[in-house]
């Protein structure tokens, strides 16, 4: 067994995260860079240290999680969601939405601000999940630097954010109240059911093909009939019919 295999086995025991489901070359590069900075010589040495040092384990988990996020990322896709997709999923009931792998919260807050502006919507609830507890802590606070808000229209910024003395911006309570943040491992934990919309963007690119297929199936199963899965702009699903989905627009897939 090579030292990376030893590491992945130990990592799964310590964190519950199965690294064999992530693209190996990408993950190895990230981990090697981290353990070399910490002064370790091999995956084996690093694994032994992680077992004894909880702070190092937490830091490593934090560094390995991809936390690149901003409000209204790929703005045109959000316009499509508003104009073409919401009419497909609107019903007489409040919408049930899942922002999966929500990172530091920009995505679920973008969703909430967009939904709050819809006339005639009977309400909505957003479940926002991520594997990284530090990211979730930041998300719950809802405080961001101005650079995260570059794509936010001025009218939206004025309506839904309060500017603090240190030039940071805080999401208003009226938007926070409809979002529940929760720790969740996409690859291992149980999925809730009956979602009208699942947003999972810029996450699938990190997984192996077999892991991706498993996630597509599980997410399709979690959608209501006619519910929609919204993926990232580099994550087109080839042969979506295999998962019980049909294209609704570019990067949007509807359950049949």
Swiss-Prot record:
Q: Which residues bind S-adenosyl-L-methionine?
A: 67, 69, 73, 107, 130, 185-186, 201-202
Which GO MF terms are attached to this record?
protein methyltransferase activity; protein-glutamate O-methyltransferase activity
Claim: Transferase is one of the keywords in the record: yes
Q: Catalysed reaction(s)?
A: L-glutamyl-[protein] + S-adenosyl-L-methionine = [protein]-L-glutamate 5-O-methyl ester + S-adenosyl-L-homocysteine
A GO biological-process term: chemotaxis
So what EC number does this one have?
2.1.1.80
Keywords linked to the UniProt accession: Chemotaxis, Methyltransferase, S-adenosyl-L-methionine, Transferase
What InterPro entries does the database record attribute to this sequence? Answer: Bact_Chemotaxis_MeTrfase, CheR_C, CheR_MeTrfase, CheR_N, CheR_N_sf, SAM-dependent_MTases_sf
Q: Where is the CheR-type methyltransferase domain?
A: 1-256
- Give the main EC class: transferase
The record describes its quaternary structure and partners as:
Monomer.
Role description: Methylation of the membrane-bound methyl-accepting chemotaxis proteins (MCP) to form gamma-glutamyl methyl ester residues in MCP. CheR is responsible for the chemotactic adaptation to repellents.
Name recorded for this polypeptide = Chemotaxis protein methyltransferase
């Amino acid at each position: 067994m090579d030292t990376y295999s030893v590491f992945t086995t130990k990592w799964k025991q310590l964190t519950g995260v199965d690294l064999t489901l992530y693209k190996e070359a990408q993950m190895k590069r990230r981990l090697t860079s981290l353990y070399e900075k910490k002064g370790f010589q091999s995956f084996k040495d690093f694994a032994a240290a992680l077992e004894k040092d909880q702070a190092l384990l937490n830091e490593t988990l934090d560094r390995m999680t991809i936390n690149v996020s901003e409000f209204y990322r790929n703005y045109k896709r959000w316009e499509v969601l508003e104009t073409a997709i919401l009419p497909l999923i609107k019903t007489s009931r409040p919408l049930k939405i899942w922002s999966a792998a929500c990172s530091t919260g920009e995505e679920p807050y973008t969703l909430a601000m967009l939904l709050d502006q819809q006339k005639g919507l009977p309400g909505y609830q957003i479940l926002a999940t991520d594997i990284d507890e530090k990211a979730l802590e930041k998300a719950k606070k809802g405080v961001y630097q101005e650079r995260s808000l570059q794509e936010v229209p001025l009218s939206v910024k004025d309506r839904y954010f309060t500017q603090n003395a240190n030039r940071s911006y805080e999401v208003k309570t009226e938007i926070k109240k409809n979002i529940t943040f929760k720790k969740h491992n996409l690859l291992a934990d149980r999925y809730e059911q009956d979602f009208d919309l699942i947003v999972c963007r810029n996450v699938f690119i990190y997984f192996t093909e077999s892991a991706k297929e498993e996630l597509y199936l599980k997410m399709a199963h979690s959608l209501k009939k006619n519910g929609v899965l919204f993926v990232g702009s580099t994550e087109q699903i080839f042969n979506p019919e295999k998962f019980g989905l049909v294209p609704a627009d570019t990067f949007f897939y509807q359950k049949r």
